[in-house]
Amino acid sequence: MSIIIGIDHGYYAIKTAHCSFPAGLTSYGEHEPYTRQGLLEFGGCFFVCGSGRQPIQRDKTANDNYYLLTLAAIAKEIQQRGLPPECSVRIAAGLPLTSFGRDKPKFREYLLRSNQPVNFKFEGVEYSITIEEVAVFPQGYAALMTETGLLQDEPSMLLMDLGGWTVDLMRIDNAIPAADTAHSLELGMIRCVDDIREQVRRETGLSLTDAQIENMLAGQPCTVSDTVRDIVNKQGRKYTEHLLSATMEAGFDLHAIPAVLLGGGASVVSRHLSPKDALCKTIFLLDDKVNAVGFERALAAVSRRKSEA
C-alpha cells in the first residue's frame, strides 16, 4: 500500500503535513560535509538541505535542486510518521493557478522519474522510495479543503496565498474558483525580509540574518536593540500597507469582499493590520503547512472517487 505525501515546494520553504524547512540547498560534491543535519546523499554526491536560501528560480524544473529537496521532504515526513524507509509514495504537489495549466505536465514529469525506486541516504538513514504517482493541484484553493466551512459561509471571497516570492490572488464564487481572476504579485516574504534587512542596514549599519528578521516579524524573542525592533515593526506595517494597496489595484475590493490569507506571510499581515485598514473581513490560516495538508486531502478525495466509480 502506498502512502500520500503532500509537498508544498515554496521559494522560501519546503513544507509537508508535519515538517517545514528552508528551501536552501548546498552541494558538497563528492566530499562529505561536517554535519549530518539535513545531509542528503544521492547519486554519489553530498547535499545539505535547509541551509539558507537559494537564488530565486522561476522555473523550478530548471535543475535538480527541487527534486533533491523533494527527497529530503519525503524522508523527513516518513520519519515523522514512523514509517519504514522502504515504501511506495504518491506525491501530492501544487502550483499557482496563474501558471497551473502551463506548468503542470512539466512539473509532474520532473518529480515522477523513470528510475524507480529512488535510493538515497538522508541524515544517515538509507531510503528506497518508489514514487508511484505525482498529482498536482492548485495552491491555495487546495488548502481550503482543510477548512471546508469557509466555502459554505460566503458567496464570494478572496484567496490570498502569501508565499516566498509571490502573493497569489484568486476570487472564489459559490465555492468555485474564478480562474479568470487569478493574479500574482511579486510581494512575497523574500521581498519583505530583504527590504527590512536593507532598511536596518541603512539606518543602523547592522546586518541582520533572515532568522532574526523572521523571529521579530512573528513576535518571537530576538536579542536586538529596541531601535532595530522598531524598524522591523515599521517595515512590517509598511509591507502590509503595500500588499493591501497592490491587491486593491489588482481589482479586488478588500472593503467589500472577505479575504482568506494563508502561507508564510499570513502571520506577518495578521500582526500588522490596523483598524484603519477597514477591511471587510479577514480569515487567517496561520499554519504554513496548510497547503501540503490540502494537497494530501485533495489526492485522497480523487482516489476515493476513482475507487467508487
Feature locations, PLM:
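Conserved blade-register residue in beta-propeller folds
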Residues: T16, L169-R171
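Ser/Thr-glycine-rich phosphate-binding loops at phosphate-binding pockets of nucleotides
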Residues: L162-D168
